[in-house]
Curated annotation (Swiss-Prot):
EC primary class: hydrolase
Protein name, UniProt field: ATP-dependent rRNA helicase SPB4
Gene that produces this protein: SPB4
Residue ranges, compositional bias (Basic and acidic residues): 564-576, 583-598
Q motif, short sequence motif: residues: 10-38
Major localization listed first in the record, in broad terms: nucleus
Catalytic reaction list: ATP + H2O = ADP + phosphate + H(+)
SUPFAM superfamilies (alphabetical): P-loop containing nucleoside triphosphate hydrolases (SSF52540)
Coiled-coil positions: 528-597
Residue spans of biased composition, Gly residues class: 621-630
Record GO terms (molecular function): ATP binding; ATP hydrolysis activity; RNA binding; RNA helicase activity
Keywords annotated in UniProt: ATP-binding, Coiled coil, Helicase, Hydrolase, Nucleotide-binding, Nucleus, Ribosome biogenesis, RNA-binding, rRNA processing
Keyword ATP-binding attached: yes
Amino acid sequence: MQTNKGSLLWENLRVDLEPWLKDAIRSLNYPTMTPVQASTIPLLSGNKDVIVEAVTGSGKTLAFAIPVLQKVSKRLYQVPEGEEKPEPVKRGHMLAIVMAPTRELAKQIQMVFDKVLELLPEEDSYEPRIKTQLLVGFLGNVREDLDSYQENRPQILIATPGRLLDFMSLQIVKTSSLEIVILDEADKLLDMSFETDVIKILKMLPKQRRTGLFSATISAAGDTIFRTGMNNPVKLQVKTKNFLGEQNNAPTSLQLSYMMIEPEHKLTTMLQMLRDNQFKKAIVYFPTCTSVKHFYQMLSKLCKSSANDIDISALLFFSLHGQLTTKSRLNTLEKFTEGNDESKKYILMATDVAARGIDIPDVDLVIQIDPPTDPSVFLHRCGRTGRANKVGRAIVMLNNDTQEEDYVGFMEVKSVFMTKIDPPEDKDNHSFHNKFQKKLRKYMLEDRARHELAVKSYVGFVRYYSKHIASLIFRLASLDYIAIAKMYGLLRLPKMPESRYIENEKMPEDGWLGEVVDMDTYAYLDKSAEKARLENLEKDKLAKAENAKRRKELKVKNEAWSSKTEKRETKLERKEKMKRKREAIEKQLEAEQERGGLDEEEVKEDWKDLVRKNKKKQKSNGGGGGGGVLQGSFDDL
């Protein structure tokens, strides 16, 4: 869709907005519309359902906020024909719903609405006031939400799906008056994690309503769109072109780059870029919640204690991930957004919880330590900078000696184009990296808990890597596990199935990455944790000693049993030998009987005498087994 600057003036908007809304837009210093706003507002303010796919930072939030406020305003303040005053909204009813996949995005959407509503005139004709209510998980409970809903009677609900479904299941909440529903980041809301709740909510709403779906990657939602109950929707796609004239899903103000780098150097390269580049605020994306927690703790500590050799004291880090409470996440986001100390550089370390829809002013740089497992998230991450036609840079780090450079071509198929850049030079032969690694090892040795968190982060990264959609590019077999472990600050490689990919000649002895550490004396800084560790260590020592004692007793018992068995076997052998001797004597006596005519009684007597003589002979020879003619004839038996 091509537009010129004149056609984007608010005066040329093809819909007659409420007077107060026109004045509010003028007061907020929005001189012109963006293409997505110029296309969407007239359709959604009228009687059209819309599916809007537009690049990040293109003004999508205002593109649906204005139609929502227009519809609510008309419903509250316009007098129907034949009536003396507007029809009041019944108790328990709402007029509009806006759904978002994350609490942070929902909060930011509410801030946009409230910013416009602050300019609603303080006049009797604008009563009741237009109000919004935020419904997100872990921020209060459903009972508190209901109390607020009944007391304030908001017309616009801004919510995440789970909490909204719980809220709408209450009997007192009515949906029959609803006029419009918006799904922001609709592709995420319609994927497996939210789809069931979202479809249930939509089925609870009136069929005669307007529906708007908004996202930078709406095509990822696929056929699920048809389950949203839209009526003949208009699909709007607002895209840009790069300097080669190719369609680009990223805004032209956003410079997308990638660098090939040794895994071990990723963290220090990131720090060098943050230290040396000029920017106000930056966002650095990490793979997992645990890795954000690990690197945030590490860098916050090292920044405070860093000397001139690796001066990173001007960097101020913030942490944002899904394991934080809602209150902590919103507070962090607020502090990062409002930070304005000119002597500091503000860096938000985050997972993909900060990838969608969040609009933070003055974010000039985005760095991705690793690409996201879902390629559709890549553009959402990058889109936190270069918003509203401001210049921004987004850089993704790819591992050397792997197939990861193929990711660039993979993203080009999705109309996302990147240029290659070189890592910043370390002029003194990796001196920054080496100094940082020494400080990192010292940091790890100070507290056993830090190393445990590092190991957990490392294992989490390997699992994260194994789940990449582009598995032919991101292969576990090609990773440099030792280099990655050093980047995470590990003292020793953990035992895990993926270790089989490490070549035998490269595998360090017992997995130690540097000097061997005595794990019995490797202590926790936390006194209670250390006390518990020492108690467990003592228990383990006693248990080992007890086990050793039992093994020794069992060995003796086994030996005694073995000796008895041998004696029993010897006794049986002697009996067998005596039996053979007896049989031999009997045969000899029978032979003599035949030759000499001895009778049976004499044979028996002679046999007994022969045995007695043989025994006497054995005794006279010291029990040596006898040496006579008769005995000699038995020796080979």
